[in-house]
Amino acid sequence: MTKTRCMHVHFRKILQRVKKTLRLSASDQQSQGVTEPLSLGDLPEECISLIISFTSPRDACVFALVSKTFESAVQSDIVWEKFIPPEYESLLSRSQHFSSKKELFFALCDESVLINVSKKDLWIEKATGKRCMMLSASALNLSTHHTWKWITNPVSAWLETVPELLTTRWFEIRCRTNTRFLSPRTRYSVYIVFLKADICYGFAYVAMEAVVRMVGHELSESCRRYVCFHEAMEWQFLTRKNLVNPERREDGWMEIEIGEFFNEGAFRNNDEIEMSVSETTQRNTKRGLIIQGIEIRPTKKPGNEMP
């Protein structure tokens, strides 16, 4: 099957979804004189734009490859306005001009144009249009502040200073944040982003308890798991099969997925999510962890959206 034919089939499926959403029943179609299934040639460009707006930014870019008509339809503000947070104007840190909603969308995806709100950096995931958030280290509740020192950021320029752990036995990081800036009806994964200093020890065989939960929602899901900040050697994976291990990021940092949650709400809701990573039982000496912050991104698994 050719790429164009595949896109046509995909388009027809989307059209069926739109009809269902608009509750356009078969009898409604018949009363309007529609006796045959709609074909692509029957649709005006504005209608094509509207239908594409029900997909995702990734799909929209693929649709643009189908034909000149589709390419033109994808450029419409009708498409990209659906992918932009409705409250974006109140989140922009400074006045900026964009020639189109598409240009605005890709600007909000650019990490160099982060939106800063109360120690939170917000941006849009390019493929899905979902909102992401980074809580900087200054927004975190670090156990016993005198056991941390603030140093020049060794990797990123947008955060000038980050905390480095001094010698301690009691390790605990906690934070809370409102979920109203995140995309509604979306499952999110939570990551702690970190580095290890030149002198770093006390984390190799230590399991940290990580908890992610909705505040005040006792009946809602609570995610609890054990993580390790030390990269496992190949021979260690069997003995650490129940631990979540760190992964290296493209930006030079490392991250550990500490939990997941489902964000039901929308902008202006009052739901809060609480996240913590702690180890207070073994009491072994620890040193040298550098924390960038906690990042919240859409989960890269089936079930990202509720039906």
Swiss-Prot record:
Organism domain of life: Eukaryota
Molecular functions (GO terms): carbohydrate binding
Entries under CDD domains matching the protein: F-box_AtSKIP3-like
Alphabetized Pfam families for the sequence: F-box, PP2
InterPro entries from the UniProt entry: F-box-like_dom_sf (IPR036047), F-box_dom (IPR001810), PP2-like (IPR025886)
SMART domains according to UniProt: FBOX (SM00256)
Domain F-box, residue spans: 37-83
Signal sequence bounds: none
PROSITE patterns: FBOX
Listed name of the protein: F-box protein PP2-B7
Species: Arabidopsis thaliana (Mouse-ear cress)
Organism ancestry: Eukaryota, Viridiplantae, Streptophyta, Embryophyta, Tracheophyta
